């Protein structure tokens, strides 16, 4: 079997911390170990930089960089050339908004029956309003584009042979909004969490743990960073370590949203916060190891958090709010409804060794369900069903 995967890259400047890249090199290794040919289409700027993926399985083309380019730019001629050369059995599309482009290309080449499209939606352009209703994500609505992006995702559900999202919460978001606008989904949205990154287990753990609280998420306003800043301000007796994966963010991306820079500057003003560059993977892992607990993002529409899973892999318990996909990721006794309960959980984890150990154990239980081999087996099961 031949699989041709189209990479989604949201962070070309810091590729080591890009979730789409991590997802693809993780499943690529598993597919190749099973004797399945797995090639990846990647942005040409990354030529020579992707040492986690065999060079014989990389194809470099011109792709988008910004959040809109990646959703609208499609190198038709270059992708067509690869498909005609390879005749893949599966086109694994990690930028689901481009599904209709791929389908049209397959129709034109006469390969629409031979090549199946598997679309993986890494990020639905939806959010939760203050009233608790599903709404468009304002961070993807510059110029009113969010509705079109969502429409392309719904088109992908109906066109792709398989359409995956990361969590039941992500599926619920898409289905709820489709019902709200009267859009008929003709096919099933399937749930498939991203696998954990094997490198998190392979790295040695030499760091000495301190009573420090880790926050290892992007600093967008939409991630709830301002709520985190308020929590830090109200708890000056606690020490926080923030790993920012976007310190090298390019100006072409920053002009759409300056909140990561604004929030980073606000955190730098606080005496109980230290900020590290989270884009280097080994430095990032050492930062996780040095902390006692971690806090999930405060994002009300969080469809998954690979950063939370990173902590689980390194034996670090994570607390988080009792909403969104955290109900599927974080043990119930580590979720909170109020800021006061959040503080109580922090104190308990810092002061009670037995509770901390029980929390580590419970967090690690999830990992059995999302190992790379388990996730690839689940993908193969669904692929076999449509072939």
Task: Give residue spans per PLM region.
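Acidic donor-binding loop of glycosyltransferase active sites
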Residues: 289-303, 316
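A charged, aromatic-enriched C-terminal amphipathic alpha-helix characteristic of glycosyltransferases
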Residues: 353-386
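Membrane-proximal helix-turn-helix segments that form the acceptor-binding/catalytic region
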Residues: 125, 139-163, 262-263
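Donor nucleotide-sugar binding/catalytic pocket of nucleotide-sugar-dependent glycosyltransferases
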Residues: 158-202
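Conserved donor-binding/catalytic core segment of Leloir-type glycosyltransferases
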Residues: 164, 205-223, 229-235, 241
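Nucleotide-activated donor-binding/catalytic signature segment of Leloir-type glycosyltransferases, i.e.
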Residues: 254-285
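Short hydrophobic beta-strand element within catalytic cores of glycosyltransferases
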Residues: 313, 317-320
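Active-site proximal beta-strand in glycosyltransferases
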Residues: 90-92, 108-145
């Amino acid at each position: 079997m031949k699989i041709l995967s189209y990479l989604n890259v949201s962070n070309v400047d810091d590729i080591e911390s890009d979730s789409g890249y991590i997802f693809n090199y993780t499943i690529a290794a598993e597919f190749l170990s099973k004797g399945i040919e797995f090639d990846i289409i990647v942005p040409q700027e990354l030529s020579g930089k992707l040492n986690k993926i065999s060079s014989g399985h990389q194809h470099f083309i011109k792709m988008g960089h910004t959040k809109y380019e990646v959703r609208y730019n499609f190198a038709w001629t270059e992708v067509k050339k690869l498909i005609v050369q390879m005749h893949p059995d599966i086109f694994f599309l990690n930028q689901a908004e481009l599904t209709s482009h791929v389908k049209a290309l397959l129709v034109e080449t006469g390969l629409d029956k031979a090549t199946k499209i598997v679309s993986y939606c890494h990020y639905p352009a939806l959010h939760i309003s203050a009233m608790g209703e599903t709404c468009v994500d304002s961070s993807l609505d510059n110029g009113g584009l969010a509705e079109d992006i969502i429409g392309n995702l719904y088109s992908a559900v109906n066109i792709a042979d398989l359409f995956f999202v990361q969590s039941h919460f992500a599926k619920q978001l898409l289905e709820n909004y489709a019902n709200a606008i009267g859009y008929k989904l003709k096919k099933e949205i399937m749930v498939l969490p991203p696998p954990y990154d094997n490198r998190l287990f392979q790295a040695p753990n030499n760091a000495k743990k301190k009573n420090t609280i880790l926050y290892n998420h992007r600093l967008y306003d939409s991630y709830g960073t301002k709520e985190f800043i308020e929590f830090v301000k109200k708890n000056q007796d606690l020490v926080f370590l923030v790993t920012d994966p976007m310190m090298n963010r390019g100006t072409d991306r920053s002009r759409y949203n300056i909140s990561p820079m604004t929030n980073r500057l606000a955190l730098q003003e606080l005496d109980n916060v230290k900020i590290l560059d989270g884009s280097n993977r080994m430095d990032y892992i050492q930062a996780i190891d040095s902390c006692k607990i971690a806090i999930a993002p405060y994002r009300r529409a969080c469809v998954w958090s690979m950063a939370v899973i990173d902590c689980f892999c390194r034996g670090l318990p994570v607390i988080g709010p009792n909403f969104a996909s955290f109900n599927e990721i974080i043990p119930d006794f580590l979720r909170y409804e109020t800021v006061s309960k959040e503080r109580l959980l922090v104190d308990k984890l810092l002061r009670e060794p037995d509770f901390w150990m029980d929390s580590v154990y419970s967090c690690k239980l999830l990992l059995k369900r999302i190992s790379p081999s388990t996730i690839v087996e689940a993908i193969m099961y669904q692929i076999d069903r449509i072939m």
